Amino acid sequence: MTLSRLLFATVAALWLALGQAAPAPQTIRIGVASPTVGSPPIFTAGPFGIAYSKGWLEQEFKRDGIKVEWFFFKGAGPAVNEALTNRQLDFALQGDLPSTVGRSVGLKTRILAMQGVRTNLYLAVPPDSPIKSVADLKGRKVGIFLGTNLQLPSDRVLADHQLSERDLRVVNLDLAGIDNALITRNIDAGFTDQRVLKLRDKGLARIVYTTRGTAPRYTRQNALLVADDFANRYPDATTRVVRALVRASRWVSDPANEAETYRLWAQMGVPESVIREDLSGEPLRSQFSPLLDDFAVARYRDVADGLLALKLVRRPVAVPDWFDHRFLDAALQAEGLTGYWLPVNAAGSNVARAAPAPKAGQAKS
């Protein structure tokens, strides 16, 4: 940690601990690049979904009379970018590709913490399809959720099989649309996420390819971002929002909470067995680390380079300058969790020994 980051973290932690007066917003507006399910609306995905479902952010700011407003976007990352452009959001939970696109066109944001790393991609087809591999997609009608963090990994998988989007008949569909199109056979194949395993289990789809267990460049990342203006005006409130994500990530990583974690995640409509299968092979503590480590920076740099190479953006993005470690450092210090998560290097390997989990009651509240 640099001297400036250490100083910021120390001052912010003292602010939180001593309850000193700090500039405060009347409302905190958080945008999520995902729709809710059900009525009343349910959102439980990832650590921040747990925080939302348990009302931890509302509890954090209630004593100060600060209102927390949540906005969920069926249009995913591109819709979040539009809301950020119109200054309708202060924070955003967003995938790597759309946030990088936003940065490239001048959206002034900062990456504060990771929300989920190394998320898998699946290629699915109808169960009786003649398609046996990625190479068989040439000339086929394929669903891809364009503009989201599924697009670039899909393009990379295609490129490794000497294909590009131009070789396919690409249909821009959201994930629910891909599910429906596979069932009704309105597409020949679709690049999608873990939810398609539910269709597989019902005999409605077959998995042709998955990025599980492959190189990190094929995976997708999600992060918490803040609007520059908000972070500059309200550094204390920004740290407290990050602190809520840190608490949620710590809660998810605790084996004592595993059963409830999967139960809550399954409320999004994906069976617990499917979620467990998708996340198998690596502890939740690693998959939901909030750290802005070398791996996170490398993945976003790779996305920025990939977008530029594919001419999906016109201007390069200075990725390291986009990551603001200070708020996460302060939140980890305030929660007594500095060293709890294991940093990962750019290649995806652990680079240090993580601190043991704090005993019950050790983490500061």
List the model feature ranges, each with a label.
Residues 27, 37-68, 85, 103-105, ...:
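Short, polar/charged alpha-helical segment
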Residues 129, 171, 176-269:
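Pocket-lining segment of extracytoplasmic ligand-binding domains
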